[in-house]
Amino acid sequence: MATLITSTTAATAASGPLVDYLWMLILGFIIAFVLAFSVGANDVANSFGTAVGSGVVTLKQACILASIFETVGSVLLGAKVSETIRKGLIDVEMYNSTQGLLMAGSVSAMFGSAVWQLVASFLKLPISGTHCIVGATIGFSLVAKGQEGVKWSELIKIVMSWFVSPLLSGIMSGILFFLVRAFILHKADPVPNGLRALPVFYACTVGINLFSIMYTGAPLLGFDKLPLWGTILISVGCAVFCALIVWFFVCPRMKRKIEREIKCSPSESPLMEKKNSLKEDHEETKLSVGDIENKHPVSEVGPATVPLQAVVEERTVSFKLGDLEEAPERERLPSVDLKEETSIDSTVNGAVQLPNGNLVQFSQAVSNQINSSGHYQYHTVHKDSGLYKELLHKLHLAKVGDCMGDSGDKPLRRNNSYTSYTMAICGMPLDSFRAKEGEQKGEEMEKLTWPNADSKKRIRMDSYTSYCNAVSDLHSASEIDMSVKAEMGLGDRKGSNGSLEEWYDQDKPEVSLLFQFLQILTACFGSFAHGGNDVSNAIGPLVALYLVYDTGDVSSKVATPIWLLLYGGVGICVGLWVWGRRVIQTMGKDLTPITPSSGFSIELASALTVVIASNIGLPISTTHCKVGSVVSVGWLRSKKAVDWRLFRNIFMAWFVTVPISGVISAAIMAIFRYVILRM
C-alpha cells in the first residue's frame, strides 16, 4: 500500500509540470493522424496493389477489404512493434529530467516522417514508412542528446533487416511459386492438383494468421496468457476446420465453375460473340484475302467489287484467336486503313467492309472513332499468350474500367497500363486520345503514346504497354504503301523489351479462376500483417508522447492502449480511400506482370515474413518484403519480365528515405529546443 501511494505521488508530481505541454499533445495527435494518412496512402499498395492490378478485385472492393483488415491488424498486432519503435531505437532514460524534450522529439519525428511520405505519395513513389520513422527518430535524438542518445546496436540490426527482409521474402516467395508451378501450373490438367491444394493453401493462411495473433500479437486481449501448446492447438484446429470447409464446399463449387468455363468455347464466349445476320447459304459469297489480291487491286476494293450479301459479323471485341507460333503469316489478320482500303456500309450502321469481303459490325462508340480518324486495327490474340488470359478475366467480366476506375463510364485511364492495353486490344486510334489529353498532361502522355513516325526514340513504357507495342503498330495514311499490311511477325518482337518471353509462363484460364479467390485471401492476409507492422510507424511516437504526458515517466511500463492503435488504423484507412489509388497504380503493374498464381505466391510469402517479424518485435518494411517477392517471382518467370530500372530506383529510394526524414525531423527538433522550449 505504501508503495502504491509513493508511486502515485511521484506520478502526480511529475505530471504536474507537463500540463503546460497539453498543446504539444494536441499537436501530436493531429500530426499522428496525418502520418497515419500518409502510411495508408503509400504502403497500402503493398497489400492490394497486385490484386487490383491483375483485375481480381476492383479498387473499391480493395479499399473496403483493406479498411477492415488494416484496422483489425493494427489493433491485434501493432502493440508489439510499437514497443520497439518507442523504446528500442533511443535511450529514453536520458530524458528522465527533460520529459518535455522527449515529447518535442516525438512530435518532430512524426512531422518529419509525415512530410516525406506525403511528398512521396504525391509523386507516386513507393517508400518505406518504417524507414521514415526510424530516420526521423534518430534525427531528433541527435539534436536533443547527440550520439549518446541513439542505440546504434539496435540501428544496425534494423538496417540489416532492411536487406534481410526482401531477401528472405524473395526466397520464400520463389520456393512457393516454384512448387505451385511444378505441381499445378505445368501439369497437362492443372485443375485436379489445384483443387487438392486449395484446402492446404487456405489452412496454412488461416493457421499462420491465428498463431501470430495469439502468440504475441494482442497482449491486451489476453492472448499472451495462453500457453504455447494452447496457441498451437487452437491455430491447428482452426486451420483444419477451414480446410474441411474448403474441401467440402468451396472445391465442388469451384470445380463446377471451371467446368462451365471450359465447356464454353472461345467462339461461344460473350467476349468474342459472333452473330451471322444472314443465312448460311450466303456464306459461299465470302471472299478470301487471297481471292481479292488475285482478282482485284486492293485499292479498288469497295462496295462495287464486293457483294453486299457478304456475311455481317458482329463482334463485341475486334480480335481473333490464334495458336502461338502456329499461324502462318498469310493467315494473320491485317492492319487496315479504313479510309483507303475499306468502306463503311451506309445501309448497315457501323458495318465496315474488310478486304476479305466480310462486314464487321462495330458498336456506336467505335464507329464514331472510325469515322473520325479512319484507323482501326485487328490483332491476332494467341491462346497461349498472356494477353489472351488477361482478356478472359477482364473483358469477359466487362470490368476493365472498374479494375482501376470508378465506373464503366470511364473505362480508359490516362497514364496507366490499362489505357494503352485496352486501346491496343480494341484497335482504337491514339491520335484523338492524344489530342484531347496531350495539352493538359503532355509529360504524362509520353509514357502512354507510341513514338511519332519522325522520331525513332523509344519511349519507356510499363510491361503491358510494351507488350501491346509489340503486337500492334499504328500506321498513318502516309506510311501505308499497300492496301493491307501484315501484323508484326514473331521475329520482330524478339528484339523488343515487350518480347513474348515475358508472357510465356502464364496461367491458363481455369488456373486463373482457381487462384483468384486465393489471391484475395492472401491480399487480406497481407493487409492484416501490414496493419500490425506499419501502424507502429504512425502511432509509436504518439504512444511515447501520450504516456509521457499521462504518467510523467519516460520509461513507462504501461502497455500500448488499444484506442491509440485504433486511432492509427482509422488514419491509415482514410489515407487509403483518398490517395491509395496513386501508389496502387505504380506497384500493381509496373514492376512485373502479375497473374493470380504468382500474386498468391508473392502475397502469402511476403505477408508471412512480415507477420513473423512483427511477432519478434523487429520493425521491417512491408515494402521491402513485397518488392523482394515480386522481383523473385518475376525473375523465376522471365528475367525480362522484371522492370530492372524501376527496381533500381526503388532500391535507391531505400537509402534516401532515412536521411531525408532524419534531416526534416532534426530541423523541427532544433526549432523546438532552441526557439520554443529553450532547453
Curated annotation (Swiss-Prot):
The keyword Transport applies. It is a multi-pass membrane protein. GO terms for biological process: biomineral tissue development; cell population proliferation; monoatomic ion transport; phosphate ion transmembrane transport; phosphate-containing compound metabolic process; positive regulation of canonical NF-kappaB signal transduction. Induction: By phosphate deprivation as well as by IL8/interleukin-8 in hypertrophic chondrocytes. InterPro entries: Phos_transporter. The modification Phosphoserine is found at residues 265, 269. Residues 550-558 are annotated as: A. One of its GO terms (cellular component) is plasma membrane. Coiled coil: none annotated. Keywords: Cell membrane, Host-virus interaction, Membrane, Phosphate transport, Phosphoprotein, Receptor, Symport, Transmembrane, Transmembrane helix, Transport. It comes from the Eukaryota. It catalyses: 2 Na(+)(out) + phosphate(out) = 2 Na(+)(in) + phosphate(in). Optimum pH is 6.5 and 7.5. The keyword Membrane applies. The chain crosses the membrane at residues 21-41, 62-82, 100-120, 158-178, 203-223, 230-250, 511-531, 558-578, 600-620, 650-670. PANTHER family: PHOSPHATE TRANSPORTER, SODIUM-DEPENDENT PHOSPHATE TRANSPORTER 1. Belongs to the inorganic phosphate transporter (PiT) (TC 2.A.20) family. Sodium-phosphate symporter which preferentially transports the monovalent form of phosphate with a stoichiometry of two sodium ions per phosphate ion. May play a role in extracellular matrix and cartilage calcification as well as in vascular calcification. Essential for cell proliferation but this function is independent of its phosphate transporter activity. Region A confers human cells susceptibility to infection by Gibbon Ape Leukemia Virus (GaLV) and Feline leukemia virus subgroup B (FeLV-B). Substitution of Human SLC20A1 region A by region A of murine SLC20A1 prevents viral infection. This is Sodium-dependent phosphate transporter 1. It comes from Homo sapiens (Human).
